[in-house]
């Protein structure tokens, strides 16, 4: 994969991640002045996950690292613009949720109940369910870690 293709893929990925970030920010009643920052943070988070995946990291660890990055940037922006970090981070993290894996797992459950047990369907169910669960766990833990690190009242040692 050439460098031009990687850059074009990254730009496309970041633009397409900014759109749902703004949409969910509007659903959550984020102030109008913060919408552009939600879009930018969603693009940064999804773009960083894409870069990590292109470099060879699996999607679970890439999502974890991207969520940590989103959390750190959100905390810094909340200090600059005097807003709660969740204003920026929650809407920005939603485009990284594993919708396709969860959908395939759900369809596999429906197929299992409708046509009966099949090893291929059960394998698709378990694989996609576990992948979706680990990605959601990585996103939630990764998003909460910067707050635990940066707002710690006691010394860590």
UniProtKB/Swiss-Prot annotation:
GO cellular component: plasma membrane
Recorded superkingdom: Bacteria
Compartments (UniProt record): Cell inner membrane
Xref: InterPro entries: ThrE_2 (IPR024528), ThrE_Dicarb/AminoAcid_Exp (IPR050539), YjjB (IPR020914)
A Gene Ontology biological process term: succinate transport
Pfam families: ThrE_2
Record keywords: Cell inner membrane, Cell membrane, Membrane, Transmembrane, Transmembrane helix, Transport
Membrane-protein topology: Multi-pass membrane protein
Annotated TM spans: 6-26, 51-71, 87-107, 129-149
UniProt function note: Involved in succinate export with YjjP. Both proteins are required for export.
Protein family membership: Belongs to the ThrE exporter (TC 2.A.79) family.
Subunit structure, interactors included: The transporter is composed of YjjB and YjjP.
The protein, known as: Probable succinate transporter subunit YjjB
Name of the encoding gene: yjjB
């Amino acid at each position: 994969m050439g460098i031009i293709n990687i850059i074009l893929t990254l730009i496309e990925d970041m633009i397409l991640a900014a759109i749902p970030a703004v949409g969910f920010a509007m659903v959550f009643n984020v102030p109008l002045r913060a919408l552009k920052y939600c879009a930018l943070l969603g693009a940064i988070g999804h773009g960083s996950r894409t870069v990590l995946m292109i470099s060879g990291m699996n999607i679970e660890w890439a999502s974890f690292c991207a969520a940590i990055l989103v959390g750190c940037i959100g905390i810094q922006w909340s200090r600059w613009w005097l807003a709660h970090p969740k204003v920026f981070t929650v809407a920005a993290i939603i485009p990284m949720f594993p919708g396709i894996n969860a959908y395939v797992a759900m369809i596999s459950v429906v197929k299992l109940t409708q046509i009966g047990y099949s090893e291929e369907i059960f394998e698709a169910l378990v694989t996609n369910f576990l992948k979706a669960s680990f990605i959601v766990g990585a996103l939630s833990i990764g998003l909460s870690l910067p707050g635990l690190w940066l707002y710690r009242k006691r010394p860590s040692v």
